From Swiss-Prot:
InterPro entries per record: UL17-like
Gene designation per UniProt: CVC1
Region described as Disordered: 131-184
Signal peptide extent: none
One GO cellular component term: viral capsid
Entry protein name: Capsid vertex component 1
Length: 478
């Protein structure tokens, strides 16, 4: 895979290992990843003991068609969509890996408007880094005779045995190996068994003319005056690059399971040069721990840390909305002139919508929420507006992190009345608050939030984040 080789050259020295993966079409559909020629790919590590992740590392990724799963090397390239890339893995100071760390893949769309995050546990990525050892199987079967003399873990195919018998013993030749010491491919084996069909002819003979002499052409050297070399350009020297051809190596494809979604993907293991020398197995941070210490290890620690962080932010917003209602004497005001169907008990209807919206907001824990996008953009000096469109009473999935920053063009509103006037420019927002069982949360880059209920009634809240919380948000989701 050229993409895997490119990642090895790009970031191979910046990490302990690289997990080379191929994500099939079913995996892409499950995580909402569509083919995008301009997409950009970044990877970071989220640790089990800290909310602060590693810096994002940009990696090379490419979409291509052609099979999925273990048959990736055999299927037609036009049959299915796949994404191939590499995930850098980080070791601790002792060169060991925590299998419960998470490698987070961030995919940014070509237009920059959409971000998708996919989490991989190290445990599911390090499997291909441990190639199987050589089996001591001789002529008499398993443990029935002498093993391979060179101690290699390779397996002979019938074609390689035929090639070895046809070529016979010779210097540098081995069972199933070419003269260069590499495993013979089926094509090379079959080609080597074919007889030469062309007629042997002599290319030189004393009765023939010198091949370098052509009649009618002056072959005398051009005698020029080399005294003045000022106008002579520098000689261009061309040299061939020592490029590595991955086709020369045995590539092992291993199927692995994405532990969070249950979908399958493929791990590619290269003996060299994209893998550590000799394919040495990795060492775990759990090695050497006592049974008592292992009982205290939480395999979901890295995942729970991030979830709790996002949940605290959402809970803080819900509490601020509740305090605003209490401080205002449970009064709510219509901010947008939207006509709705008249009810006998409009206060009770709005109260039910507010209560349900707060419950839904408390459960909306994810990196795609409007407040996350607003926090990242505000920290980078951008002024904008984002919205979460909420479906209440389980009417359907909510749509999170919709960018409404175009409403602030060419600049932010001067006062609150201008702000509400700008919101009238969003047809999608108006459609959401014209009917029941829906609500909209609007968040600006200063983390001020407004919960819009049917009829244009609004309640203002706020995300109260410390400076450290903002830095963590930008580091993880920026």
């Amino acid at each position: 895979m050229d993409v895997h080789l490119g990642n090895w050259r790009l970031c191979g020295r910046r990490c302990g290992r690289l997990a080379h993966v191929v994500l099939p079409e079913a995996f892409l559909d499950r995580h909402g990843l569509a083919e995008d020629a301009g997409a950009e790919f970044f990877v970071q590590t989220r640790f089990t003991g800290s909310l602060r992740p590693s810096s994002y590392v940009r990696v090379i990724g490419a979409f291509f068609g052609g099979g999925s799963g273990d048959e990736i090397a055999r299927r037609d390239r036009r049959s299915a969509l796949n994404l191939v890339l590499s995930l850098p893995l980080l070791a601790d100071g002792d060169g060991r890996y925590d299998p419960h760390n998470i490698a987070t893949l961030k995919v940014r769309s070509g237009d920059g408007r959409r971000l998708v995050f996919v989490d991989f546990f190290y445990l599911s990525l390090l499997g291909a880094q441990m190639p199987r050892g050589p089996e001591s199987e001789g002529e008499g079967g398993k443990d029935g005779g002498a093993g391979r003399g060179d101690g290699e873990a390779s397996r002979e195919s019938p074609l390689e045995r035929i090639a070895a018998e046809a070529s016979g013993p010779g210097p540098g030749s081995g069972r199933g190996r070419s003269a260069g010491g590499r495993r013979a491919s089926p094509l090379s084996v079959l080609s080597g068994l074919l007889d030469n069909k062309y007629t042997q002819i002599a290319k030189h003979h004393r009765a023939l003319e010198d091949p370098g002499a052509v009649r009618g052409v002056n072959i005398e050297p051009d005698r020029r005056d080399h005294g003045n070399l000022a106008g002579v350009g520098k000689r261009k020297v061309r040299c061939a690059l020592n490029l590595i051809d991955l086709k020369r190596d045995d590539i092992t494809f291993t199927s692995s399971t994405h532990l969070l979604s249950g979908t399958r993907f493929t791990l590619c293991h290269y003996p060299r040069p994209v893998a550590p020398p000799g394919g040495a197995p990795w060492e775990s941070t759990l090695d050497g721990l006592s049974e008592r210490q292992l009982r205290g290890v939480d395999p979901l620690a890295a995942l729970i840390l991030g979830f709790d962080f996002l949940e605290r932010a959402q809970t803080g917003l819900v509490n601020s909305l509740a305090r605003e209602c209490e401080n205002g004497g449970l009064k709510i005001f219509q901010r947008l002139p939207v006509c709705v169907e008249k009810k006998h008990d409009i206060r009770g209807v709005l109260g039910d919508h507010f209560t349900e919206a707060c419950h839904v907001l408390a459960r909306q824990v994810g990196e795609s929420c409007a407040w996350v996008r607003a926090c990242v953009s505000g920290e980078r000096g951008h002024v904008g507006l984002w919205a979460d469109f909420l479906n209440l009473w389980e009417a359907g999935p909510s749509t999170l992190g919709v960018d409404l920053s175009y409403l602030f063009s060419p600049g932010p509103p001067d006062d609150e009345s201008a702000f509400w006037a700008r919101l009238l420019g969003s047809d999608r927002l108006l459609d959401a608050i014209k009917t029941g069982a829906r609500a909209v949360l609007v968040v600006d880059s200063q983390l001020a939030a407004w919960l819009l209920l049917p009829g244009g009634f609004a309640i203002k809240g706020r995300y109260s984040l410390s400076r450290e919380d903002i830095q963590i948000t930008v580091g993880r989701y920026g």
